[in-house]
Amino acid sequence: MPHKVSLSRLKLTDFRNYAAAALDLDGRHAVLTGDNGAGKTNLMEAVSLLSPGRGLRRAAYGDITRVGAAGGFSIFAALDGMEGEVEIGTGIETGEETTARRLRINGTQAKTADELTDHLRLLWLTPAMDGLFTGASSDRRRFLDRLVLSLDPAHGRRASDFERAMRSRNKLLDEGRFDPSWLAGIEEQMASLGIAMALARQEMLGLLTRLIEETRETSPFPSASLQLSGFMDGQFTRPSVDLEDEYAAMLSESRYRDAGAGRTLDGPHRADLIVHHREKAMEAERCSTGEQKALLVGLVLAHARLVGNLTGHAPILLLDEIAAHLDEGRRAALFDLIDGLGGQAFMTGTDRAMFSALGDRAQVFTVADGKIFE
């Protein structure tokens, strides 16, 4: 069983609808119940900001601060992490550039948010993701990259460096500055980073596919088959150096085409995650809404198991409205599966009775008007 990473305390100041709030946890799962709009998802969002990035809502930091607050917002968390007990603080202050946030780990200023992955890994599932299979390919890429990031913390830096290099190339092409040596240098950097990104995605999907196959008979959810499409399809068994050379040549040959288009038309930023319902042999986008939700839940929980298996530390799960629209039997099976992962899960719902099958495996809190009651 993987080591259980768990929060023991969460404290918020001027975060969303919370002027001040504290949550004391005993290591069990945490169930947050209350009316819609009470602030349950806001608590989940605060926990999600203990990982790199902008959290489960991807909100601008300035928008997170409570309306009417004199300063910025702050989040404090104490947890039993991957390297032992740790305290994490993050937030912004009044007048700060709100594209970045401050981060302190055990009282020391962190150099980058990537340091958070030394202490915990987070996965989440929200109602906003229900349209993942029918929505824009950019949403699926973002979802895929978060899955990769939980196994390969360097992936986020590679992706941001690739985007930065691509913007530089696009700017040069837009300005008509076709300096061969300058562009070649940028394109070589894009090739190195882009192929590394694509290989990391392929490796993660291969590992996840094998785990789904191994647990197919025991999972209460349908099995997903996964593949990438849209960038050098079928080529990733070749040596990476050959792939880098080919992609760099592709970029060089497409300069005038990309200049006309106003963007780079080939690369990992154009790839798409293709998901099929294995039992039905059907593309996920053609499945019913309920089947899509079941596929997505099964996929996220399978990935959580993979993270625990490979890192030795179970991820913390944030499952917003996870029990909605499930019958009693499937809810019980879901809770058993979550509990069997060996980690701590935060779950929300409007009805406390929906979580009765958890029994004493969870602390249950009521959220109302920016207040939390156990």
Curated annotation (Swiss-Prot):
Pfam family, one: SMC_N
GO cellular component: cytoplasm
Keyword DNA-binding: yes
UniProt-listed Gene3D superfamilies: P-loop containing nucleotide triphosphate hydrolases, RecF/RecN/SMC, N-terminal domain
Protein origin, superkingdom: Bacteria
SMART domains per record: AAA (SM00382)
GO terms of molecular function: ATP binding; ATP hydrolysis activity; single-stranded DNA binding
The keyword Manganese is annotated on this UniProt entry: no
Keywords, alphabetical: ATP-binding, Cytoplasm, DNA damage, DNA repair, DNA replication, DNA-binding, Nucleotide-binding, SOS response
GO biological process: DNA replication; DNA synthesis involved in DNA repair; double-strand break repair; SOS response
UniProt feature coiled coil, ranges: none
Location within or outside the cell: Cytoplasm
Binding site for ATP: 34-41
PROSITE patterns for this protein: RECF_1, RECF_2
Family of the protein in this entry: Belongs to the RecF family.
Function: The RecF protein is involved in DNA metabolism; it is required for DNA replication and normal SOS inducibility. RecF binds preferentially to single-stranded, linear DNA. It also seems to bind ATP.
Protein name, entry field: DNA replication and repair protein RecF
Gene coding for it: recF
